[in-house]
UniProtKB/Swiss-Prot annotation:
Functional summary from the UniProt entry: Polynucleotide 5'-kinase involved in rRNA processing.
Upper classification of the organism: Eukaryota, Metazoa, Ecdysozoa, Arthropoda, Hexapoda
UniProt name for this protein: Polynucleotide 5'-hydroxyl-kinase NOL9
GO biological process: cleavage in ITS2 between 5.8S rRNA and LSU-rRNA of tricistronic rRNA transcript (SSU-rRNA, 5.8S rRNA, LSU-rRNA); rRNA processing
Ranges of compositional bias, category Acidic residues: 279-354
Length: 995
């Protein structure tokens, strides 16, 4: 008698055999193979020298695993006839491999006798586009098994989980006569795959790659496949094939595939995963992440080894998420600046790590919770070790690869419909690009200009001529262009408009168009009469050849075009380098001349230029042009967060600079100031256009006062005192009386926001108030900001006598709708925290003069501690000694202490403090001419020195700063991220009911 454990092992063996039979499609699931009865005694001889007897069940098992068929099954395994009338005689598998049979599965059974060449020609003529393998939808984890019928309809094969139909795609590979065939279909065409995927293939000829035995596959694939295999690939509707040669796979270990067993798991070389940012959004418009369920670029968690190995996707195609902040991620304060939104009660997106992997839980992404978004990420070489046990099997000396493009340069003929579509596309010249048919129908989320797809939107109409002697580019602008980077533009002839500013001839204007904000647009303006040719061609001939100038003259049309001279913004080189060091995102571009249509011009300019489709630039509503401005205009711009107050301010400044030589910008936003540093309010005379964020110009304000916080809830009274004093200083200065005022306010529209607005209107006495409304209700005030509404406000926070509202003046109320363009899915944008961080980096870059690359390269200024007054911005509970020690290696505000609150002149970095000599060494980020006025230092409060300055101290410093916690892989401004939790009731809408 056999032992009990031996019987258990045998039962387990039969169960595994049955599972393999079902998974490989050799048996129907309806007819399970029952394990044999308990064998009799003496079935297995106890004598080692005598051969063991083989039971009938063992013979049946061997026959099932053998590729040879018994006489009983020969009819079911017979090869499908070449046509309906011609039958193929039975033969063994080895004999069939000697014949050159190019029979391939066809959607139409009549065409099954065509050879490989005919099929290749048909597939090539049908489309010139190369199919690119896609990963399936991640949210559809429930597999759908595809059942395949044999030719005589007597036997059904159930595909393994590898061939599931997941969402938009289903994929399968089959070895046939030394060829590898891959079929890819869409979810909408599942019926085509079910009917035509495997029903034309016999079980003796064609073998699935997913063999359950290593010997089965090796024995049944002939030598032709190992030496010179051919690869086919079938697209969605109907079988189309691409044939090309690949190298012998057994010579390259990295090409050896890892098979998948019944559970669909497998070892992959490169896969796509998703990083979830748990954010609560108020509108679909503000969702900046991908929605993978609508895109073919995203797939399920059940990855096929063939697809994974063949994907040619790099992580560089997607933006790094190391510094990814959404509009809703900044939870530091209730009243932050424009782009900040109320949101995430769980965690800040600053804490997301780029190596995040979703947990391996079934149904994890089936129904994502409200606010849960996904961000694609490429992780390469996840599993380098070969699989063990029964999970996967490795085929030795064999390889499977996807389509290999043999000749990219050869363009097959196109159909008439495709020729008609591409006639318009050929108007623009770009580098050769492989495009899938799905890519022609709609814009993929990854088709974002400049930093996603550098070949997108090339401009052929405009003409660019590069100087051989300098970094100048002479251009004829014929259509709207958008810019990514910074450059200096000089108008030579014609008329152009740059974000509302009409450039004057021979005037050099500086453009800043960083990533994360709307691109700056350069648009030629049509004229009624041809403009005069006032270009100094002789002067241009010093940098350009005669042939180049002749091409410019020939292509220039006087009524519609403009001639401009572009050159690199060398004065901003330190600023660009600082952003490159301390920002994970490429706020300014990394120019690569090899893959851009105008790479040489962009290399000279260190800036990317392309034709604008007006989807990523500022679109000015007509009502904006109806806002009239006079010399005595006092215009307050109010609205919630992210409604476009700064964009409107810059447009009004740019449009009216031709009428007024200068204007006064009063910036009352302590979270996201337009000109000066955060935690301050200021006023600045503007006499040049703001063609980009104002803080990148590093302008010095006329007056500035330190508030000391970015959250007005924590400094409400101090903020009001600072505003009252600043307005009094402006009103007492006669030079500001005859120029227009533009007042930028905070985006704090809840809580006591309307009470604060009433106080501002009472003190400033405006002539106009522009209220910008957002489609997101939470970003709007609870009532209209007219005179009657503000007059009925009963103060609660500002109830003291010094904040008493006397009488609300009369003013004109302009109600506008937000003109902020819809954000593209998956694009990175500057959040409020990013804006403050960028503002600080821009200001600190002004310290780096000459050849200085770090703060340690700058010569500090020494000053006696006895001559300085040391203050804390929001508290008086600290001693002088504590404040002095807190300033070391940190940012401080450089102020002049006079009557009232101290006047802020700029910022600086305390390099060191000599306690024995009582001297302080300072690196100022302000003009040295005003340093003689500094007699007071105020601690930076929340504004600390970015960590990158402590980590990268220059080549002359060999040791780290003592007592400083440094993360080598961090580029953020703080080592420990602060997470703020806000109750959903604060927003007035339950978390599960938000849009």
């Amino acid at each position: 008698m056999l032992d009990e454990h031996i019987l258990k092992e045998m039962k387990l063996s039969f169960q595994l055999t049955e599972q393999r039979e079902l998974a490989s499609g050799r048996r129907k699931p309806e007819k399970p193979q029952h394990p044999p009865a308990v064998p009799k005694k003496k079935v297995i001889s106890k004598v080692a020298s005598n051969p063991a007897k083989i039971s009938e069940t063992m013979i049946q098992k061997a026959q099932m695993e053998s590729p040879k068929k018994s006489k009983k099954n020969k009819t079911a395994g017979a090869k499908r006839p070449l046509s309906n009338n011609v039958s193929n005689p039975d033969s063994s598998p080895s004999q069939k491999r000697l014949k050159k049979d190019n029979t391939l599965p066809k959607k139409n059974p009549v065409n099954k006798s065509s050879n490989v060449a005919a099929k290749k020609s048909a597939a090539t003529s049908k489309s010139a586009k190369l199919p690119i393998p896609k990963v399936h939808s991640i949210n559809e984890l429930a597999p759908k098994k595809t059942k395949v019928k044999t030719p005589n309809k007597t036997k059904e094969a159930s595909l393994s989980k590898k061939h599931k139909v997941n969402g938009n795609k289903s994929s399968m590979k089959v070895v046939q006569n030394g060829k590898v065939v891959e079929i890819i279909g869409t979810a909408a065409e599942t019926s085509d795959i079910e009917m035509n995927s495997l029903d034309d293939w016999s079980e003796e000829d064609d073998y699935l790659i997913e063999s359950d035995s290593e010997n089965d596959v090796v024995e049944e694939i002939d030598e032709t496949f190992l030496k010179d295999p051919k690869i086919f690939k079938v697209k969605c509707k109907g079988p189309e094939y691409k044939l090309s040669d690949i190298l012998p796979p057994f010579e390259h270990d990295e090409y050896q595939p890892l098979l998948l067993d019944g559970d669909g798991s497998g070892t992959v070389r490169k896969i796509k995963v998703f990083k979830s940012a748990q954010e609560e959004t108020d509108s679909d418009e503000d969702d900046i992440d991908y929605e993978p369920e609508d895109s073919d670029d995203f797939g399920s968690e059940e990855f096929d080894s063939e697809e994974s190995d063949s994907e040619d996707t790099s992580s560089a195609d997607y933006d790094s998420d190391g510094d990814f902040y959404s509009e809703y991620s900044d939870m530091e304060d209730v009243s932050d600046s424009d782009s900040e939104e109320f949101g995430s009660d769980i965690f800040d997106t600053d804490d997301l790590d780029s190596t995040y992997e979703p947990p391996d839980i079934e149904g994890f992404f089936d129904h994502p919770p409200v606010g849960m978004q996904r961000e694609p990420l490429i992780i390469e070489e996840i599993f380098d070790d070969p699989p063990v046990e029964k999970k996967q099997e490795r085929i030795e000396q064999s390889s499977v690869m996807d389509i290999v493009v043999k000749n990219l340069s050869s363009v097959p003929p196109k159909k008439e419909s495709e020729v008609a579509i591409e006639t318009e596309e050929n108007d623009e010249v770009s580098l050769p690009e492989v495009v899938t048919p799905e890519k022609e129908n709609y814009l993929q989320p990854s088709d974002v200009p400049f930093y996603r797809n550098p070949q997108a939107n090339p401009t052929e109409l405009s003409v660019f001529e590069n100087s051989l002697k300098s970094n100048h580019v002479l251009a004829v602008i014929k259509e709207d262009l958008e810019v990514y980077g910074t450059l200096v533009l000089t108008l030579l002839c014609g008329q152009i408009s740059v974000n509302g500013y009409r450039a004057r001839r021979q005037e050099a204007i500086t453009i800043y168009s960083p990533k994360g904000l709307n691109w700056v647009s350069i648009s030629p303006t049509k004229t009624k009469k041809p403009v005069k040719d006032e270009v100094n061609w002789e002067e241009l001939n010093k940098n350009f050849t005669r042939a180049q100038l002749d091409r410019i003259k020939t292509s220039f049309q006087r009524q519609t075009n403009a001639i401009v001279l572009l050159h690199r913004n060398t004065s901003a080189q330190q600023l660009v380098d600082t952003f490159g060091k301390h920002m994970a995102q490429n706020v300014f571009p990394l120019v690569n001349s090899s893959n851009r249509p105008f790479g040489q011009s962009e290399t000279l300019l260190h800036c990317l230029i392309q034709s604008s489709d007006q989807s990523r630039t500022l679109q000015v509503p007509q009502v904006w042009n109806k806002l009239q401005m006079h010399a005595t205009s006092r215009i307050i711009v109010a609205g919630g967060k992210g409604v476009g107050k700064s964009s409107l301010l810059r447009y009004l400044i740019n449009r009216n600079l031709g009428q007024f030589p200068s204007m006064l910008l009063i910036d009352l936003d302590i979270g996201q100031p337009e000109i000066f540093v955060p935690q301050t309010i200021s006023c600045t005379v503007i006499d040049e256009p703001l063609l980009g964020p104002g803080f990148l110009y590093n302008r010095q304000p006329e007056h500035a006062i330190v508030v000391g916080h970015t959250n007005i809830v924590l400094c409400a009274e101090q903020y009001a005192r600072a505003v009252i004093q600043l307005v009094q200083n402006i009103q007492n200065d006669a030079k500001y009386s005859n120029i227009p005022w533009l007042i930028n306010t905070m985006g704090y529209n809840k809580g006591f926001g309307i009470e604060l607005m009433a106080l501002l209107v009472d003190r400033i006495r405006p002539t106009d108030l522009v209220q910008i409304a957002s489609p997101i209700p939470i970003n709007n005030f609870d009532s209209v900001l007219d005179r009657n509404s503000l007059s009925q406000i009963k103060p609660i926070i500002y109830s003291a006598e010094e904040f008493k509202i006397n009488e609300i003046p009369k003013y004109t109320l302009h109600k506008l709708i937000s003109a902020v363009p819809a954000r593209e899915k998956g694009t990175w944008s500057l959040s409020a925290k990013d804006m403050r961080y960028s503002n600080l980096l821009a200001r600190l870059s002004s310290c780096l003069t000459g050849n200085a690359k770090s703060l340690t390269d700058c010569q500090p200024l020494g000053v006696s501690l006895e001559s300085l007054k040391i203050l804390h911005p929001t508290s008086k509970n600290y001693s002088r000694e504590e404040l002095i020690r807190g300033m070391e290696a940190n940012v401080v505000y450089l102020c002049h202490h006079g009557a009232g609150l101290p006047q802020c002149l700029g910022i600086g970095v305390v390099r060191a403090i000599d306690y024995e000599r009582k001297e302080l060494y300072l690196v100022p980020a302000m003009p040295l001419q005003k340093m003689s006025l500094v007699d007071c230092l105020i601690l930076g409060g929340e504004q600390s020195l970015p960590q990158g300055f402590l980590r990268d101290q220059g080549q002359g410093v060999s040791s780290s700063v003592p007592f400083v916690f440094i993360l080598d892989d961090s580029k953020s401004s703080k080592s420990i991220q602060q997470i703020y939790h806000r109750a959903p009731a604060f927003l007035g809408v339950p978390a599960n009911q938000r849009n």
